[in-house]
Curated annotation (Swiss-Prot):
The lineage of its organism: Eukaryota, Viridiplantae, Streptophyta, Embryophyta, Tracheophyta. Residues 81-339 form the Protein kinase domain. This is Calcium-dependent protein kinase. There are 3 contiguous domains conserved in the CDPK subfamily: a kinase domain, an autoinhibitory (junction) domain and a calmodulin-like domain. The autoinhibitory domain (345-375) inactivates kinase activity under calcium-free conditions. Residues 1-11 have a biased composition (Basic and acidic residues). Ca(2+) 3 binds at residues 465, 467, 469, 476. GO terms for molecular function: ATP binding; calcium ion binding; protein serine kinase activity; protein serine/threonine kinase activity. Residues 37-55 have a biased composition (Low complexity). It comes from Daucus carota. InterPro entries: CDPK_Ser/Thr_kinases, EF-hand-dom_pair, EF_Hand_1_Ca_BS, EF_hand_dom, Kinase-like_dom_sf, Prot_kinase_dom, Protein_kinase_ATP_BS, Ser/Thr_kinase_AS. It is found in: Membrane. The active site is at 205 (proton acceptor). Activated by calcium. Autophosphorylation may play an important role in the regulation of the kinase activity.
Length: 532
């Protein structure tokens, strides 16, 4: 969860590509977790045959290496591609720009370190994402998959380079916006859903960050780039694992009984944000967001909704219908009067306040997530030895994350008598990125003794404050965030404006601690419950 390019550590998107699929250390479908082990029959001794003719040279057989993930012989990516500048970095590896040697064409390469794929689930997840990328490649609005290579250290996924950046960045940079522009964007997003469902794939993690523009051209195509949580649809199967990102999760996911209709809900949330600048279900923490989603009350009264067309609001309502059986399908969305090309969507500019709110929403929590990563990486083995053991005991399937069920059973083994509601509150408190599981770094920062965490906050501040001036400047923040592939100049400005309460253009220590305190107050409950 929450990771740089994965659902682990922190959500650090490097040019929109992630250096490991989002599913690697998050809840995966049960059918991928365990397979029955069958005893193999003993090999019978072969009778010896006396050689009568000339000796034959044995035929060379290329067998896969013993530590292969893809089940085929290793191949050096450098034979076909030259790796160039780094686009992003995460716990699982890096994303590079690469050049095809034969054509000079630029691509993106996700290089995933195999030693980070510790469990059987991790390896199955990467194989499944590759299968889905190969299956969907060539379809409109989906990133083109070029190929995969494996060597002793890494798995390399080569795909189309989407140089146009993130969706929200483009909208904000343009500075003007209309319902017609929102309809054009949403049509491309729903087209991805339509193609996925038609080809038997459920995406399960639709959100703006998973879409990039193919180029910097004005009319660049929107491309879906991340299929780390996607699965092949099994007809008649009811899916029960909580996956996705908090703001975009459908109510039936929270009820642990869902199907492909969840993708329409997520697309509806994106459309609501495109029209208003904020998500439809909002709260200070994940539990509050989930409660709001389950309640299902959608605000069409606040600005700018009175000036949004009735046709647009009608489509949003139909996409955000609580009952998935009554929710509109992807084909019906594309045929809606507001959504159709040349349809009812107006070219009248939307209120500029929508763009301002969109900027704030995008910048939210990025600095906090990076600070927690810095803190967790600063801890010595001695300091976290007991916590590491506790995490391992709770992570019963060795997936690298703790699910709700694992947390509940782990607390019971510790003698806790917490109710299911209280366990969910603990889950929400520790789950910084809101993807429904607790990764190792989130667990460590949630369970550390409070005074120790506070002392490390000073160390984290010093990590950003390179010149020891007592302030984090724009340049210092930019340097730190780019080191982890986390943000462009616009994002950095937005973060400073959000945290900088005295408006002097810098972040002082008190402002930094105030930001961290908002996260720490939520996690205090988690720490007390585990260590008391």
């Amino acid at each position: 969860m929450g990771g740089c390019f994965s659902k682990k550590e922190y959500q650090a998107d490097g040019n929109g590509y992630r250096s490991a699929p989002t599913a690697y250390h998050t809840v995966t479908d049960q059918s991928y977790e365990k397979s029955s082990q069958r005893s193999q029959p003993q090999a019978q001794p072969q009778p010896q045959v006396q050689q009568t003719g000339p000796s034959l040279k044995p035929r060379q057989v290329h067998r896969p290496e013993s530590n292969t993930i893809l089940g085929k012989p290793f191949e050096d990516i450098r034979g076909k591609y030259t790796l160039g500048k780094e686009l992003g970095r995460g716990q699982f590896g890096c994303v590079y720009q690469c050049t095809e040697n034969s054509s000079g064409q630029l691509y993106a390469c996700k290089s995933i370190l195999k030693r980070k794929l510790v469990s059987k689930n991790d390896k199955e997840d990467i194989k499944r994402e590759i299968q889905i990328l190969q299956h969907l490649s060539g379809q409109p609005n989906i990133v083109e998959f070029k190929g995969v290579f494996e060597d002793r250290q890494s798995v390399h996924l080569v795909m189309e380079l989407c140089a146009g950046g993130e969706l929200f960045d483009r909208i904000i940079a343009q500075g003007h916006y209309s319902e017609r522009a929102a309809a054009t964007i949403c049509r491309q997003i729903v087209n991805v859903v339509h193609v996925c469902h038609f080809m038997g794939v459920m995406h399960r993690d639709l959100k703006p960050e998973n879409f990039l523009l193919s180029s910097k051209d004005k009319d660049a195509m929107l491309k879906a780039t991340d299929f780390g949580l996607s699965v092949f649809i099994e007809e008649g199967k009811v899916y029960r694992n909580i996956v996705g990102s908090a703001y975009y999760v459908a109510p039936e996911v929270l009820r642990r009984s869902y199907g492909k209709e969840i993708d329409i809900w997520s697309a509806g949330v994106i459309l609501y944000i495109l029209l208003s600048g904020v998500p439809p279900f909002w709260a200070e923490n994940e539990k509050g967001i989930f409660d709001a989603i389950l309640e299902g009350v959608i605000d069409f009264e606040s600005e700018p909704w009175p000036s949004v067309s009735n046709s647009a609001k009608d489509l949003v309502r139909k996409m955000l219908t609580q009952d998935p059986r009554r929710r509109i399908t992807s084909a019906q969305v594309l045929d809606h009067p507001w959504m159709r090309e040349g349809g009812e969507a107006s070219d009248k500019p939307i209120d500029s306040a929508v763009l301002s709110r969109m900027k704030q929403f995008r910048a939210m929590n990025k600095l906090k997530q990076l600070a927690l990563k810095v803190i967790a990486e600063s801890l010595s083995e001695e300091e976290i030895k007991g916590l590491k053991s506790m995490f391992a005991n709770m992570d019963t399937d060795k997936s690298g994350t703790i699910t709700y069920e694992e947390l509940k059973s782990g607390l019971a083994r510790l003698g806790s008598k917490l109710s299911e509601v209280e366990v969910q509150q603990l889950m929400d408190a520790a789950d910084v990125d809101g993807n429904g599981t607790i990764d190792y770094l989130e667990f460590i920062t949630a369970t550390m003794h409070r005074h120790k965490l506070e002392s490390y906050e000073h160390q984290a501040f010093q990590y950003f404050d390179k010149d020891n001036s007592g302030f984090i400047t724009k340049d210092e923040l930019e340097s730190a965030m780019k080191e982890y592939g986390m943000g462009d100049e616009a994002t950095i400005k937005d973060i400073i404006s959000e945290v900088d309460s005295d408006n002097d253009g810098r972040i002082n220590y008190d402002e930094f601690c105030a930001m961290m305190r908002r996260a720490r107050n939520r996690r205090k409950l988690f720490s007390v419950s585990l260590t008391s």
